[in-house]
Amino acid sequence: MTDNEKEVMRLLSNRATVRRGFEMLVGLYSEKIYWQVRRIVITHDDANDVVQNAFLKAWLNLDEFENRSKISTWLSRIAINESLDFLRRKQRQSGINTDDEQLIENKIADEYFDGDAIESLLKDAIEQLPDVQRTVFTLRYYEDMKYSDISSIL
């Protein structure tokens, strides 16, 4: 556990400093959580919405964190579950799976998309995976998580 993580845990454990601790927690992990979510839900706007919901859920359930795992693992689990819930809702609302045309439109409109041909092929292949498999793939190969950590998150 890093010094920052220790400080966050110390602040979160005291009612008088819990708000400051959570602000520090958001500062430490928001970018990491954003990119985990972004690789699952694909678009920037959707990722921002899911991340906001994940941190809100973490704040509302802070007293349920039991300190058996790292707080970053707990946050990741919340964010990934929120991402998968978002995709399920989106799929129910559309009534069909996201088709290739929509994926291409998202990629073209994505200001962060690099455009490199190999990266494009890889991104296409990853986007075709079922939600849970895509999540496992991104956590393992983009986040370098161990399978045991991934299984505890999912």
Region roles according to the model:
Residues M1-K32, R39, E127, L154:
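N-terminal module of bacterial RNA polymerase sigma factors
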Residues T2-E7, Q93-E119:
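Internal acidic/polar
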Residues N14, R39-I42, N53-K70, K90-Q91:
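Sigma70-family region 2
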Residues A16, D116, I126-R134:
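Short helix-coil-helix linker/hinge
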Residues W35, D49-L56, S69-N81:
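Structural recognition of an alpha-helix C-terminal capping motif at a helix-to-coil junction
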Residues D45, S148:
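Residues within helix-turn-helix
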Residues E64-E66, R77-N97:
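Arg/Lys-rich amphipathic alpha helix in sigma70-family domain 2
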Residues V136-R140:
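A short pre-motif secondary-structure segment
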